[in-house]
Curated annotation (Swiss-Prot):
Functional description taken from the UniProt entry: One of the essential components for the initiation of protein synthesis. Stabilizes the binding of IF-2 and IF-3 on the 30S subunit to which N-formylmethionyl-tRNA(fMet) subsequently binds. Helps modulate mRNA selection, yielding the 30S pre-initiation complex (PIC). Upon addition of the 50S ribosomal subunit IF-1, IF-2 and IF-3 are released leaving the mature 70S translation initiation complex.
This protein's name: Translation initiation factor IF-1, chloroplastic
Protein family according to the UniProt entry: Belongs to the IF-1 family.
Compartment list: Plastid, Chloroplast
């Protein structure tokens, strides 16, 4: 049986080495996020201030996988 993941939205606070990011979730929790392979393969650039969807395990709620970068309303891309 596959493990159920919780999906949250948050804002990138800080960029760390090796594709890791500090993310503040909408419920004010700070967690460590890493970039999923699909985002890495697609060369999607994630910068501090970007809103992202992050998948968090039930067993370790301090780490999560960034699965989607949400579009900013004020950007042109």
């Amino acid at each position: 049986m596959k493990e159920q993941k919780l999906i949250h939205e948050g804002v990138i606070i800080e960029s760390l080495p090796n594709g890791m990011f500090r993310v503040r979730l909408d419920n004010e929790d700070l967690i460590l996020g890493y970039v999923s392979g699909r985002i890495r393969r697609s060369f999607i650039r994630i910068l501090p201030g970007d809103r992202v969807k992050i998948e968090v395990s039930r067993y370790d709620s301090t780490k999560g996988r960034i699965i989607y970068r949400l579009r900013n309303k004020d950007s042109n891309d």
